[in-house]
């Protein structure tokens, strides 16, 4: 903070920007100038993680955390807190149990069990200012690597740390680097997979928006270790803010000599370019990603050969995702003992999750491997809204599985998740309560993967389409119990014969929900699911038309009053839906 008395940290991640944090920053600058305050600075930061409470403003070193800040609140914060030292209570986060304001971020339950490694600088530094990154030990790991370590030393350190890929399967990062290093040839490449395709996942985007220099530094370290002189970041074009900040970081790194020729006078040359993806989910698979960068169709190829042997332009290529890279500089500087002290025996370090769904606190959480779903949902997430019961967590994105109440205390790591029919994936974590229909959930994810299939292999292209047809028949009251066995058999056939990970894991949500919620499938197969229309009382105008037209007289309510449908008597004929002039009648699922 240099000679500053206070720093005003304003979140400018995508979520807060959409809620006008740009204007919040402008208003703080104007107010500071208006009051002629010389020892206070307003600066932008990346995502704080607590996205459900944004826009967020934090005052340092007071550690006061303001939530739901609007541009109109700025003058009050400056007049009360900055000038007179009185925090604005109405903007503080409220304890959900007693509604008392919490002044200090460290006392908030959302952050209580988090351990920030990959997200360490997000919410602390200005992501568009390389000097800020340097002040937090930025590029010190690169200096150490280039002046004190051989490439094999670096690889051995990453191996010893136990770091595993954070993008899906959890392959050991050090072994992947070793394979590329061992591959013959002078021309090698290192890629960063920033094509974050899971619905609801935004971990990688937030790291690139909040700490882009950490990825530049890590890729340069990886290039040195594997023998690559050229790096490529493959990022989806739908991430304009992340792209802007990554471009800024690369440009500034070149200006400072951290990229380019003879970095730190070591004789090592390395540079990075950005390539854009069009949002295809399948391009998150490393061979499809490489094909896309080469200008080809984004289709996976069978392995071996692996990219570490034959990748981009036929040359050895390393592919890691954003979160994996974000761990590298910290491991280099703090050592393997520090990193291995977090996590479980086979899954070291932390994992970032995008917590969403039926939970009170939504946002990004970074927790040590080995934490339980109960701790994430109830201690960090604040529990289920409206007193509803926990039903399941969907983990691993569209290709993942369910963690139910029976497994809510299972420590989360790669092996444990695999044993219960789920997977780590990139880190999507969707909480579901007693009202969620698990057959509908399975259909939702299958619709996504079926739509995202590249179409190269028949099991995925045709198999997922047939699966979806059978699921829709069940939900439309056209299925039978025989269909359940057909669905399960087709799931296993697709898994065993699809060409790539997308097809091989597409049936996971179906198999997982069939395993843990068989009764819900049986109810549909036996035609026991009651289908009834409902009336949205906020829209109902009491015109009484629906009640007059209903053939079974199951709608109650006098003219000019809110009406209600008796769901036990409703035959789902749709007459009320067609009759209502204001769209107040809601169709059954």
Tell what function each PLM region has:
Residues 1-7, 19-44, 61-90, 135, ...:
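Ferredoxin-type iron-sulfur electron-transfer modules in oxidoreductases and energy-metabolism complexes
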Residues 243-369, 381:
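Hydrophobic alpha-helical positions that pack around
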Residues 53-57, 459-465, 545-564, 575-589:
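Iron-sulfur cluster-binding cysteine motifs and their immediate structural context
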Residues 218-220, 369-385:
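Short amphipathic, charge-patterned alpha-helical segments
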Residues 347-361, 367-369, 373, 529-567, ...:
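C-terminal accessory/binding modules appended to enzymatic or scaffolding proteins
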Residues 92-160, 313, 320-335:
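Flexible inter-domain linker/hinge segments
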Residues 16, 159-180, 279-291, 297, ...:
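Conserved phosphate/anionic-ligand binding catalytic regions in large, soluble enzymes, centered on
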Residues 10, 125-128, 133-140, 190-204, ...:
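Gly-rich Lys/Arg/Thr-decorated short loops/hinges at beta-loop-alpha junctions or inter-strand turns
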């Amino acid at each position: 903070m240099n000679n500053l008395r206070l720093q005003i940290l304003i979140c400018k991640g995508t979520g807060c920007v959409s809620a006008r944090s740009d204007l919040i920053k402008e208003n703080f600058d104007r107010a500071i100038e208006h009051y002629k305050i010389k020892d206070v600075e307003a600066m932008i930061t990346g995502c704080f993680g607590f996205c459900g409470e944004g826009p967020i403003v934090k005052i340092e070193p007071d550690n006061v955390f303001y939530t739901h800040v609007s541009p109109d609140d700025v003058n009050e914060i400056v007049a009360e807190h900055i000038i007179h030292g009185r925090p604005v209570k109405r903007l503080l986060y409220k304890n959900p149990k007693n509604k008392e304001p919490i002044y200090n971020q460290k006392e908030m339950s959302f952050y209580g069990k988090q351990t920030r490694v990959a997200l360490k600088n997000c919410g602390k530094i200005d992501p568009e200012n390389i000097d800020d990154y340097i002040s937090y030990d930025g590029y010190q790991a690169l200096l150490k690597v280039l002046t004190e370590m051989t490439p094999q030393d670096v690889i051995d350190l990453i191996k010893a740390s136990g770091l595993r890929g954070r993008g899906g399967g959890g392959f050991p990062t050090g072994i992947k680097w070793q394979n590329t290093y061992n591959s013959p040839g002078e021309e090698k490449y290192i890629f960063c997979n920033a094509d974050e395709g899971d619905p609801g996942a935004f971990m990688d985007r937030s790291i690139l928006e909040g700490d882009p220099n950490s990825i530049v530094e890590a890729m340069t370290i990886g290039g040195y270790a594997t023998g690559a002189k050229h790096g490529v970041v493959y990022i989806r074009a739908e991430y304009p803010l992340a792209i802007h900040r990554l471009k800024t970081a690369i440009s500034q790194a070149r200006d400072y000599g951290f990229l380019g020729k003879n970095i730190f006078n070591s004789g090592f040359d390395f540079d990075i370019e950005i390539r854009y993806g069009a949002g295809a989910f399948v391009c998150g698979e490393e061979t499809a990603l490489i094909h896309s960068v080469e200008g080809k169709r984004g289709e996976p190829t069978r392995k071996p050969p692996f990219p570490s042997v034959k990748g981009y332009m036929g040359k050895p290529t390393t592919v890691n995702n954003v979160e994996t890279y974000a761990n590298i500089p910290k491991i280099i500087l703090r050592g393997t003992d520090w990193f291995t002290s977090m996590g479980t025996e086979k899954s070291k370090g932390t994992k970032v999750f995008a917590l969403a769904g039926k939970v009170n606190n939504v946002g990004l959480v970074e927790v040590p491997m080995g934490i339980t779903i109960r701790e994430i949902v109830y201690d960090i997430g604040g529990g289920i809204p409206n007193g509803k019961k926990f039903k399941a967590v969907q983990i691993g994105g569209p290709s993942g599985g369910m963690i139910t109440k029976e497994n809510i205390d299972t420590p989360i790591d790669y092996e444990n998740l695999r044993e219960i029919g789920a997977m780590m994936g990139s880190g999507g974590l969707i909480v579901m309560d007693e009202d969620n229909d698990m057959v509908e959930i399975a259909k939702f994810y299958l619709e996504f993967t079926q739509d995202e299939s590249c179409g190269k292999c028949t099991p995925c292209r045709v198999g997922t389409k047939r699966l979806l047809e059978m699921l829709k028949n069940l939900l439309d009251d056209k299925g039978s119990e025989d269909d359940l066995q057909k669905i399960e058999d087709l799931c296993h056939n697709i898994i065993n014969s699809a060409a790539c990970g997308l097809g091989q894991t597409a049936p996971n949500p179906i198999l997982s929900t069939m395993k843990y919620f068989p009764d819900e499938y049986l109810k549909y197969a036996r035609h026991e699911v009651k289908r009834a229309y409902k009336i949205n009382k906020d829209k109902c105008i009491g015109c009484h038309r629906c009640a007059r037209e209903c053939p079974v007289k199951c709608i109650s309510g006098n003219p000019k009053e809110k009406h209600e449908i008796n769901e036990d008597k409703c035959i789902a004929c749709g007459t009320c839906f067609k009759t209502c002039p204001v769209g107040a009648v809601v169709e059954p699922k």
